Regions:
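Right-hand nucleic-acid polymerase module
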Residues: 88-92, 205, 234, 261, ...
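Conserved pre-motif C helix in the palm subdomain of viral-like polymerases
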Residues: 76-106, 208-237
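A common structural junction motif
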Residues: 268-276
């Protein structure tokens, strides 16, 4: 039976709901997904899918929306795609089912989007490598991985994997080979399992044609990203070379600089054979005494901490927000307490509270893995300096008129304190 048949099964949806709500899932997301299940909103999407399977040249799945996300910390822009609300939710279930049914395809060095595996698990497993502190490392990112994967090269791999489920392959092929995307954003409604404003584009939305790879941002992209470089993962596994991949992030280790350079060349060659390239700005070859950075973590001997680049990124966000709130305060002749309270609310939410769609919070991502508070103290100190600036309007010694007790009264929560609370609870 095709996996597509499971998409109309209420029991499968209840299992999916239990899984989603077992994670860091905000109440409004739970409520929206619950309503979607109770109203059987997935049935109409299942009909759309069956229509595509029966006549893929005549029937088409609703188009994904194309969005451009600007990264405030750089001049880069990231292109992401989102299907309409109901369709996106059904594709999430399909992805959930595929990642579990086909997990045995993947070797142990792959950690992304897999059941019972995670970025944190990757870091902990790397720490178990024998004589890791004596090894050289080479880390690299695949350049624009999701949107650069050549669909014509992916399809044969996908067809081979799904040879016993031709209906599923027909449907996925129709999505991957659809040349059009929607541009209009104003008519997209809130998704039933997301607190962001994505989904449900109207029929009159403007469309364009473009090469979009596996469409970063869509649920199924995670399965495709794992599958496409499966043979590279397997090569390193078969040769018993210490290696890990999390989607487009790759790291490999060797006993000598010459050895690890050879592995790096092998990675670049395999990527080129797959129509991909490395991001030269993200290449790092490190000596044993330097430690290494992977997935936002810095590892050196037995120490696991937040990576310096991640600390810098958070400090930049805080500085921008503090300056923005200071302008807002001055323009509206508001008291410093109001601006400081807004700053605290923003970063409490960003660092400590659940985000949309069961994403891990910043703190949970790091707290479950790091074993030192050094970086947290740096971030705490910088955050407190921003709050002092907003309260006093100055960077001079007068800023110390604002006391730590004042911060707490406005709702401030220290990362170091939150970390120790987390570790005590986890014991």
């Amino acid at each position: 039976m095709s996996l597509l048949k499971e998409l109309s099964n209420p029991e499968i949806w209840e299992q999916f709901y239990a899984y989603k709500t077992s994670l860091a899932c905000p109440k409004d997301v739970k409520r929206q997904l619950r309503g979607f299940l109770d109203e059987r909103g997935y049935l109409s999407v299942c009909d759309e899918i069956q229509a595509v399977v029966k006549a893929p040249l005549e029937n088409h799945f609703p188009l994904p929306r194309r969005s451009v996300i600007s990264k405030q910390s750089s001049q880069k822009k990231r292109i992401v795609y989102t299907y309409p609300q109901a369709e996106n939710t059904v594709l999430k279930l399909l992805t959930y089912l595929m990642l579990r049914k086909y997990d045995s395809l993947f070797s142990d060095g792959l950690y992304s989007f897999r059941p019972n595996r995670s970025a944190n698990g990757a870091v902990r497993d790397l720490m178990k490598i024998q004589n890791l502190h004596l090894k050289y490392s080479y880390k690299v990112d695949v350049s624009n991985y999701f949107n650069s994967i050549p669909v014509e090269r992916l399809l044969p791999k996908l067809e081979e994997v799904l040879r016993e489920d031709p209906e599923l392959f027909t449907f996925l092929k129709s999505l991957l080979t659809e040349p059009c995307v929607a541009l209009r954003e104003s008519n997209w409604a809130k998704a039933p399992d997301s607190s962001s404003e994505d989904a449900n584009v109207k029929e009159q939305a403007k469309t364009i044609t473009e090469d979009k790879g596996i469409m970063a941002g869509t649920p199924l992209a995670s399965f495709y990203a794992n599958l496409y470089l499966r043979d590279m993962d397997q090569w390193f596994y078969d040769h018993e070379i210490p290696y890990a991949r999390y989607s487009d992030d790759i790291i490999v280790f060797g006993d000598t600089e010459e050895e690890v350079r050879k592995y790096g060349e092998k990675i670049r060659t395999l990527l080129l054979e797959h129509g991909l390239s490395v991001n030269p700005k993200k290449e790092e070859l490190r000596r044993p005494e330097e430690g290494f950075v992977f997935l936002g973590f810095y590892l050196n001997h037995d120490v696991i901490d937040v990576a310096p680049a991640s600390i810098m990124k958070m400090k930049k966000k805080m500085r921008r927000k503090a300056r923005s709130l200071m302008r807002w305060k001055d323009q509206n002749n508001l008291p410093g307490e109001k601006a400081a309270k807004a700053f605290i609310r923003v970063f409490n939410r960003k660092l400590l509270e659940s985000s949309m769609d069961s994403d891990l919070t910043w703190s949970y991502w790091y707290f479950s893995t790091i074993n030192t508070t050094d970086s947290l103290r740096v971030i705490d100190h910088y955050c407190q300096e921003c709050i002092r600036y907003l309260l006093t309007g100055t960077h001079t010694k007068a800023r110390f008129n604002a006391k730590y007790e004042d911060f707490k009264g406005l709702g401030y929560q220290s990362l170091v304190h939150a970390y120790y609370s987390f570790t005590d609870t986890s014991k």
